[in-house]
Amino acid sequence: MQDATYFTQPVLTWQRRYEALRAFFVDRLPTQLVAERFGFSAGYVRLLCHQFRHGTIDLSESLQQDKPGRHKVSSDTRGKIIAWRQHRLSAGQIVELLSEEGVELSVRTVERVLAEEGLPRLPRRTRLKVGLTVRGMQVPERSQSLATIDQLEGQRLESTGAGVFLFAPFITQLGLHEVVQAAGLPGTKIIAATNYFLSFLALKLLGTERYAHVGEHAFDPTLGLFAGLNVLPKCTALSTYSYSLDEIHLTRLQQAFVQRSSRLGLYDGKTINLDFHTVPHYGDQSVLEEHWAGARGRVMKGALTLFAQDAQSKLLLYTAADIHKEEADDQVLTFLSFWKRVRRGVRPTLIFDSKFTTYRNLSKLNQQGVKFITLRRRGHKLMAELEKVSSWKRITIANEKRKYQNPLVFESQVPLREYDGEVRQIIMRGNGREKPAFIITNDQEAPVDLLVGTYARRWRVENGIAEAVKFFHLNALSSPILIKVHFDIIMTMIADTLYSRLAQNLRGFEACDAPKLYRDFIKGKGELGVKEGRISLTYPRRAHNPILRAVPWQRLPQKIPWLNDAPITFHFQ
C-alpha cells in the first residue's frame, strides 16, 4: 500500500528528477538542499534545471523501470574480444579495433564480456607499457636480433628504404660481416656487433643526417631485416654504442676493411691523394681545437680529419680524426705506416698540398723510397727569382676536359731547408691562376707533363670530401668526442665504397656520385616478401629500372650470410 513516502522519498529515477525540479521551482528550495534530499549532486540539480528551462529533459515514466537491456554481443565479436585480450589489449583499445571493423560497442560492454569469460582486468600500466607516449604517439618495438627470418614467413612489407637491399650482394662480396668479427667490435646481450654495424651502415646508405633521425624508420621492419633485427635500434642505443668504441676497435675495423678491399683489387695503390678536412663544431662549450677550414676561409673550432684517396679508383682508403695541431705534420708518416701493413711491398706516390707536412718529413719519405708530389710555398724570394727565368717550355696535359691544357713550365733542382739533398722543382704558369705554381717532387724520372697532370688530379680527393659533406653529412658533427667522429668517418668511407661498387655495375652510370645514384636508384618504395626462407624484393616501375634489370645479379652473391644464408632475388617492374 502506497503512502506519502512515495512522493517524499521517490525510488525511480524519473520520479526523483520530477520531485527535485518541483521542489526547486514550486517550493523554492535551495539547490544544495534539493540535492541532499533526492540523492543528487548540486551540479546535477543545476543541469536538470537548465535542461528543464530549455525543454530538453524527458520526465515521462520509463517502460523498463530504469533497467535498460544489455547489448547483445555476437559469438564472432566475442571471439575477437577474447583474442585481443590475449594480446594484452585494454578494453578501450579493443573498442577502437571493433569500431574500425564497423562494430560499435561501449567500453563497459567489452569489460562485461571479458568478465563473463573469466578474464581478469589488466593491471594499471604506464603509457610506455601500453605503447603510447605522453602525446599519444605510438611507441615502436624494442630492437632485438632475429633468430631466423621464418618469423616473417608469408609477410609482404612495403618500405621506403627497400633500396638498401641492392647493396646486400656487394656487402657480402666485401665480407663486411667478417670484417666486423676481425675488428672485434663489441655487441650487447640483445644486439650483436654485426647487427649494430649494419644498422649504422643502413642509415649512411640512405643519407641520414643524424642518429636522431632514425625515428623516421622506427616502424620499418624492412630496414630492421637488412640489419638482422626486427627494427633498427633507437637513437639512444646507436649513440651509446658509438661511444663504447675505442681507437683500437676503429683501427682494426679500418685495417680489416681496407685489406679486404685491397685483396678484391678495388685499389690501384700506385698514387694516393692526401688532404685534411676540418669538421666544424658549434657547441657552446666545445673543447676542440681551432683549425683552418678551407671551405669557409677562416679558422674555427672543429675536429681535424684526414682522408686518403686512391687516385685511380677515387675510393677512400684511409681516414683519421683524432688529430691535434702538433700531430698534423706527422700524419703522412702515420698513414705510410698503415699502408705498409695493408699493402706490403707497395710504395705509392703521395700527392698533397704545401701545408700538409714539413720539409723534414719529405726528407724522411725520400729516405724510405716513397715518392711524393707537392707544392712549395710561395714567398717573396721565390717570386723574385721567377723574374730571372726565361727558358720556358710548353707542355700538354692529357686531360680532354681541362680548360688550360698547355701551360708553360720550367724545371730545376733546388735544395730545401731540413731536406737531405735536392728536389726536382717545376714552376708552372699559364694554368688559369694569377700566380705560378711551384711543384716539387723527388721523382727524377717521370716526364714533366705526367707529373703536372698527376698533381692536377689531386682535386679528386677534394671532390670526395665534398661528396661526404653533401650526402653523407660529414659536417653534421653532434659530439666533440673524436672517437665517435672517427667511427662516423669510417662508416662514410665504407658507404662510399659500396656506392662505387654499385655504380661499376650500372651501365652508363659508372662515374656517378652517391647523391645521383641514391636519387635515381635507391630512393623510393619497394616491397619485401619472405616465402619458404627466400627474400624477394620487388621495386615498382621507375625510369631507371631497365638499368637495374641489366645488372648481372646472378654473378654476384645470391645469399645473405648474416641472415642465415637466406637467398635473395630482385624484381624490377
Question: Where on the chain are the PLM-derived regions?
Answer:
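An anionic, glycine-rich sequence signature occurring as long contiguous blocks
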Residues: 142-156, 363, 368-463, 468-470, ...
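Short, basic interhelical loop/turn and adjoining N-cap
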Residues: 36-47, 99-112, 189, 220-237
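Short, Lys/Arg-enriched anionic-surface-contact patches
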Residues: 1-17, 64-76, 185-192
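A short, amphipathic alpha-helix used for macromolecular contacts
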Residues: 70-105
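Short, basic alpha-helical/linker "hinge" immediately adjacent to a nucleic-acid-recognition surface
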Residues: 32-83, 113, 117, 121-136, ...
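Short, amphipathic alpha-helical "recognition" segments used to contact nucleic acids or chromatin
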Residues: 13-29, 78-88, 197-205
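Short amphipathic alpha-helical "interface-anchor" segments enriched in bulky aromatics
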Residues: 214, 447-482, 487, 491, ...
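Dynamic "connector" segments at or just before major functional cores
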Residues: 7, 12, 127-298, 305-325, ...
